[in-house]
């Protein structure tokens, strides 16, 4: 006990020395939690966070006011917390609501309620994160539209095979330390919460090119993020070291947690747009087997999942705040109730890992995690999963393979909810018992996944077989190590085509079925609306096209001035790179708005035939502008007057005035030195700018504006800042320099 007290004292001294505790004020987490945070949401304009709490009981000394803190994700629940409250509210028994001014740093922080006792704040609630980061997203699309669940982990950067095989889902492995890397030739410095992080610009550009190519080939892209156990530099700050190959993300430390936040924030920005969209992020590999694949320092399952759930939450909030439909996945293997090391901390059963993870995640704000599951056959060598003896029919099954995959999907539906999706992210079948059996096993497994609504994709793990697999007796590839196509290669190619069931019926003889329609969810009509294997592939994706409106050039914004008439700009669709015009038979055009009022108007271009996807183009109808009448200067002020047509006054919200004392006027003055005044009154036709500096020359210009709602967020539509209607004058008479004593001469 004395030793424990000594350790605690040493830790507290270290924390205070590090400046984590403010002098004279501390916040202490309470043992009991009479207050429960029940909701934590940010508004769509990113200006306010609303936190709702339920007061179940009043602890002695709580008083009548509660205080809300935002703390970093790595701060433990039972730790002393630094900082000042971000909000306060009076409370009674029942519900209390906090309104907080949103800051970007809060995206990956958690909120805690406390009461004040002297100079201390005593925490009386658990922690909650923002649970709707998608409200902040700038990209709300879903990316490539797929028609099947067929996917592949391709050979590194091999687009040819993906295209030839008509693959609709691609899973890639990316090394974190190769991206976050200061030892590179072309550095990109990224600032996050006051600190600098160095990324390999060339590597990121190359990855963006790869993603763009896969998207253009008709595939959704998913990425497995892997951190090497020997990672160095800033990436090494997140690594535990040890284990066999990979490390879990060390979010239990302040520097590791902040680095992970910065990394995911950067990746979300780079891969959260339509052209370079990563549709899903898989955190680590088979996290229920930490020693082999996701080492976390030999922690207990509870401590390990504290760390992992924190990393998951950060990735979730960072990615969805940029791309609203992006997903985050936990990676799990097939050892459902099988603990490989018998109670040690090197391996955990899949079910216990999932349960513990979701419990930790849900406790700090309910979100919907997704699962990247590896459904290999029992023992990995024997392909016939329907003979797997350890794969039972109930939730107490030892393992879960393709034989009993419905046990997993039903469990997840009940445990997490029907919105959770399961990606079968890695499985392959051995060909040692014949290529026909390998092909039949793949077809059988794929049809099971196609018939199960909770499974979103089925990813085959090997294209070309690596020598490392062969050395272990695994002949899993669609192609052997020499590149020869096995029978499963062609089965993979046709598996989701209109002819699928006919092309694979000869493989039934190698299974325990007499018809593929014996599989739940598979009917003769299952693939009838799919594309024929005879038709062209890949379909041209919307990301490979651009749209011209009327007389616009390339993708320049098109703007009309309000005149009460409808404006429907003509649409022309062209191919990227070549500029070739797409025939009108390959798309339909629909104007989604009235095309008359002041605001942002949208056109939907729906592709068809050999083209896939939908393009939304926007154009603007802006208000008529005001005309400056006069600029009257004094020594420290300027009175601006203007006029505007009566009809325009009725249409607008008000005016914006810009002024600057920059030498070059508005042409060359930095934006930070141009001042803006917003007047929310369309009837006001005069304004006095105060606080000017005597002797300086000021430039003034004006525009009308109207505030409209776009995607639920207010947007100001301005008439435009013209360069013709600018007035300028001095705050007093300028100081005129003495003339030169010598006359100027012409040479």
Where are these regions (language model features)?
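Aromatic-rich peripheral "rim/lid" segments of glycoside hydrolase catalytic domains that contact
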Residues: 273, 292, 433-539
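Solvent-exposed loop/turn segments flanking beta-strands in beta-repeat/beta-sandwich domains
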Residues: 58-74, 78, 645-670
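Recognizes extended acidic, P/S/T-rich segments that occur
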Residues: 79-102, 656-693, 707-709
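Serine/threonine-rich, repeat-prone extracellular segments and beta-strand-based repeat modules
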Residues: 579-612
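Beta-strand-rich modules
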Residues: 109-118, 689-710
């Amino acid at each position: 006990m004395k030793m424990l007290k000594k350790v605690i004292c040493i830790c507290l001294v270290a924390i205070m020395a590090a400046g984590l505790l403010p002098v004279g004020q501390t916040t202490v987490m309470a043992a009991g939690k009479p207050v429960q945070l029940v909701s934590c949401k940010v508004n769509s304009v990113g200006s306010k966070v609303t936190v709702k709490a339920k007061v179940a009981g009043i602890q002695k000394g709580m008083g009548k006011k509660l205080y809300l803190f935002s703390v970093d994700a790595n701060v433990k629940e039972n730790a002393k917390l630094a900082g000042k409250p971000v909000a306060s509210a009076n409370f009674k028994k029942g519900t209390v609501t906090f309104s907080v001014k949103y800051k970007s740093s809060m995206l990956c922080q958690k909120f805690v309620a406390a009461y004040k006792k002297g100079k201390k704040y005593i925490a009386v609630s658990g922690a909650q994160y923002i649970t709707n980061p998608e409200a902040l997203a700038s990209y709300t699309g879903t990316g490539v539209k797929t028609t099947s669940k067929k996917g592949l982990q391709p050979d590194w950067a091999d687009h040819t095979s993906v295209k030839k095989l008509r693959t609709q889902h691609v899973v890639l492995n990316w090394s974190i330390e190769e991206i976050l890397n200061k030892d590179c030739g072309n550095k990109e410095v990224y600032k996050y919460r006051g600190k600098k992080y160095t990324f390999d610009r060339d590597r990121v550009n190359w990855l963006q090119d790869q993603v763009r190519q896969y998207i253009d080939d008709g595939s959704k892209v998913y990425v497995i993020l892997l951190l090497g156990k020997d990672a160095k530099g800033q990436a090494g700050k997140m690594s535990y070291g040890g284990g066999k190959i990979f490390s879990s993300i060390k979010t239990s430390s302040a520097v590791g947690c902040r680095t992970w936040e910065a990394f995911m924030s950067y990746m979300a920005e780079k891969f959260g747009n339509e052209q370079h969209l990563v549709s899903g992020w898989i955190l680590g590999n088979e996290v229920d087997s930490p020693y082999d694949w996701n080492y976390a320092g030999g922690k207990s399952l509870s401590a390990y999942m504290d760390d992992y759930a924190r990393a998951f939450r950060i990735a979730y909030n960072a990615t969805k705040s940029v791309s609203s439909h992006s997903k985050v996945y936990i990676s799990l293997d097939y050892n459902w109730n099988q603990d490989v090391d018998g109670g040690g901390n090197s391996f955990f059963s899949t079910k216990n890992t999932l349960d513990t993870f979701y419990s930790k995640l849900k406790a700090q704000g309910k979100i919907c995690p997704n699962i990247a599951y590896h459904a290999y056959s029992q023992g990995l060598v024997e392909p016939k999963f329907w003979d797997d003896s350890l794969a039972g029919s109930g939730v107490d099954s030892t393992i879960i393979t393709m034989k009993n995959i419905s046990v997993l999907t039903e469990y997840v539906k009940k445990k997490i909810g029907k919105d959770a999706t399961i990606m079968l992210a890695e499985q392959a079948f051995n060909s040692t018992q014949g290529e026909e059996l390998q092909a039949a096993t793949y077809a059988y497994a794929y049809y099971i996944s196609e018939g199960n609504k909770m499974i979103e994709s089925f990813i085959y793990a090997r294209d070309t077989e690596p020598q490392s697999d062969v050395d272990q007796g695994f002949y899993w590839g669609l192609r052997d190590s020499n590149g020869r196509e096995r029978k499963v290669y062609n089965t993979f190619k046709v598996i989701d085509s209109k002819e699928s069931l006919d092309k694979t019926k000869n493989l039934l003889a190698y299974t325990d079925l007499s018809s593929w329609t014996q599989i739940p969810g598979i009917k003769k009509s299952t693939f009838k609306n799919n594309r024929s294997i005879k038709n062209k592939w890949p379909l041209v994706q919307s990301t490979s096209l651009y749209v011209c409106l009327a007389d616009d050039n390339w993708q320049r914004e098109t703007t009309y001035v309000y005149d009460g008439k409808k404006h429907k700009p003509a649409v022309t669709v062209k191919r990227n790179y070549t500029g070739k015009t797409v025939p009108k038979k390959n798309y339909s055009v629909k104007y989604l708005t009235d095309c008359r009022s002041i605001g942002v108007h949208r056109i939907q271009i729906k592709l068809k035939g050999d083209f896939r996807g939908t393009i939304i183009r926007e154009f603007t109808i802006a208000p008529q502008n005001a005309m400056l009448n006069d600029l009257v200067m004094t020594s420290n002020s300027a009175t601006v007057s203007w006029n505007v047509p009566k009809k325009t006054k009725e249409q607008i919200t008000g005016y914006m005035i810009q002024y600057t004392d920059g030498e070059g006027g508005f042409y060359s003055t930095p934006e930070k030195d141009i001042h803006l005044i917003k007047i929310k009154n369309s009837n006001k036709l005069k304004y006095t700018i105060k606080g000017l500096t005597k002797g300086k020359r000021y430039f003034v210009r004006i525009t009308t504006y109207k505030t409209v709602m776009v995607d639920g967020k207010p947007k100001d539509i301005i008439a435009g800042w013209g360069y013709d209607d600018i007035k300028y004058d001095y705050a007093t008479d300028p100081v005129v320099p003495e003339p030169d004593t010598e006359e100027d001469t012409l040479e």
